[in-house]
Every structure is written in C-alpha cells, then in structure tokens.
Amino acid sequence: MSNTIFPGNTLGIIGINRNGVAMIAAAKKAGFNVGVYVDHSQPEITKMADFTIDGAYNDKQKLTEFGEACDAIIYQTPNIDSTVIRFLGQYAAIPQGINGLEIVQDRLMERAFLDQININIAPYVTVIGLDDVYQSIDSIGYPALLKPIQRGIGEQSMMIKRQSNITRAADFIDTGTYLLESWIDHTAEYTLTAACANGEVEIFPLAQLEYNEDRQLISVASPAEVADDMLQEMHRIIKSVADSLQYTGVFSVNFYVTSTGTLYVKNIELGLTSIANVYDNTTNVDQYEQQLRASVGMPLHVIRQLQTALLMIIRNYQAVAIRRQWLLKNNWKFRFFNNKDKDDPAGILGFVWVTGDTDLNALQNQVDDTEVWNKTLPNSESDNEEQEK
C-alpha cells in the first residue's frame, strides 16, 4: 500500500495517551480526517477525532472496522502488540512499519540490534529463574536490573542491590525469559529525538533529563550542553539506528553518561514522548508535525533551534502551588490535562515551558525560587511511561 495520503484522507491513530490531543490537532490542522482506536473510553483525549472505535486489541471485528475506515494508521506509542499492527496492515498503510516495533518490544532483540551496529550498552544476560540469577550476578555485578524480555503496559523492573535481594525476585519472576542487566552508575541522562523518512533524518536538539529517586520525570532541559565529541557520537548513534531500524517517523534514543564520560545507550523509544514535548516551544517544528509529515509522505522539516527552555512536569499534588505561578509568570507557558487519575497525587497534571533566557542555569534558578518542585514527590503507580525501560 502507498504511504502517501492527502488532506481529506483518513489517518488512524492507535496506542494513544495524553499526547494524543496534540497529535490529533496536528492532523486536523493539516486537513486530515482522524480516527482513533482505544481499548477503553478516553473522551478527554479523543473528543477531537472524527470517529472513535472502542474495542479490545484482540477484537478482530472492531479492528477490521477501524482498518477499513482508515487510509493509513500510526501507533502513537510502542505499547501496541506488533501482531495487532500487522493485522491492521491488511486494510490500511502502516507508514512506521512493523520491524522497528518488533525490535523495541523485545529487550533481547533490541540489545542484539544495538550490538550489531556497534553501540555501547550495559552488560546483560538472559535468565529464566532464580538459579540463573544467582549464577549470573557475579558476571553482571551489583547493582543490577531484572526486567521482563517483553516490554508492555504495566510491566516493571526490579533493582537487585545485594545478594539478599535475589530471594525477592522469586515473586517478581513469573514465567518466561528475563533480562539481567548491569545498572550503569551515571551522572547524567540525555535523550536525542529524531524523525526519519525516505532516507532523510532530522535531529532535534539534545535534551537533558532530571528524575527523582523513584524514576519520576521532573524536568527536561534543551538544548543541553555536552562536549562536541560526545554530541557527534550521539548523532552518529541516532543516524545508525535510523538507517538500520526500517522505521519511519519520530523516535528517540536515551543515553546514560558516567562520571568518566563514558556514553551508554539505555534504549530506543518509537513514537511520541512526553520528553519531546520540550520542542513545542524551542524549535521551529514539533514532534507531532514531524510525525505527521513522515506518516503521510511529506518531506521532513529542517529543524532549527529557536530558544532555550525547561519543560517542568506538573503533578496533581502541585495543583495549588502552580496556580500562583499561573498568575505571575509572563514567560511560562502552561498545558493542563483533564486528568482521569486526578486522585493520584503523583499523576501528571500538565507541563510548564520555562523560557525567557538563553542560560539554562538562570531558568533553573527561576524554577527553584518558586519552590513548587522542591517537595518530595509521592509514589505513583499510574504512569507507565516513566518506568525504567
């Protein structure tokens, strides 16, 4: 099927989350009809779509109805089983392809892929039970992360800091194969996001991430500053991934940097991310328009940096404190969500883009002075996007 579609045609979106509102808006602005497939009602996200089909991901009748109503279908996140996307491919074009999705959904395949293109990753072994963990931990070292091979909604990793922790893995390990991976002690985390289509690769400016101890995202800073040779290596890596993954659209590569300056690739993420929302107010084109252009056969925009920004994550428990900044800050831009998880104190309420200075340290000082983000975040069970990948 042709991956070229034109205004007036129908673009389907599956695997939607809070970023879906912006993706639907981008497609509608460009003149496309938009259909959405969800496995549970999300009217706060899908109300802008021309039609919504609510059905299980194994409901072939509903999937067929959706596929036949669309000219092309994209997955917004990689949390949709590749067999579902392959089934939909009988009825509509799948511009992003399936190969990349199958690779990133399987941690072992992803690491084999990264090894094949000579990219530095953490040491790992595969395990299927406690005996394997005991036998392998000496070669991996402490601390280590135990992760299911298959990525998916709701799955988590387990940190093993000492031998006494291994017994707890009996409750964690179910059936199937797991990955035991060295935890890389790092001083910084970065994300590089790119769009690729028809041999073109356009790379967004580097972003630096800040997490709390519970791996909840606090802020995204862009453009992040690193040594020129490290930035060149990051660009080489993301271009190598783009050239080899057989994927069309927006994707990200996440990095660790150690205290000695060693660069490790953490993982590959396909589709749209909350992290890349920083570009909504820092570059001439955002991730949503680039995803749309790649998906419908248009050439990619050449990306240009326009300004420096901090993207701050607003949690529900910060709702009262952020209201004062809403009234005071003329250089802050806000986006709030109609939250279904508003009863979770650590659920994401919205984003703030802090701009107005070319110095990220000055922007951070401005944020620190408000004391909105100085409190310890409550534990959250609702936000799978932030879990260790």
Describe each region flagged by the PLM.
Residues 105-190, 195-244, 365-367:
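Active-site nucleotide/adenylate-binding loops and adjacent lid/helix of ATP-dependent enzymes
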Residues 35, 74, 94-96, 122, ...:
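Structural detector of well-ordered beta-strand residues that form the stable sheet scaffold
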Residues 1-105:
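ATP-binding N-terminal substructure of ATP-dependent carboxylate-amine bond-forming enzymes
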Residues 6-7, 293-389:
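Peripheral (often C-terminal) accessory segments that flank ATP-dependent C-N-forming ligase machineries
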Residues 173-225, 232-264, 269-276, 293-302, ...:
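Phosphate-binding core of ATP-grasp and ATP-grasp-like enzymes
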Residues 47, 118-120, 150-154, 306, ...:
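Short glycine-enriched loop/turn motifs at secondary-structure junctions
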Residues 279-281:
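A conserved FAD-binding loop/helix module that cradles the flavin
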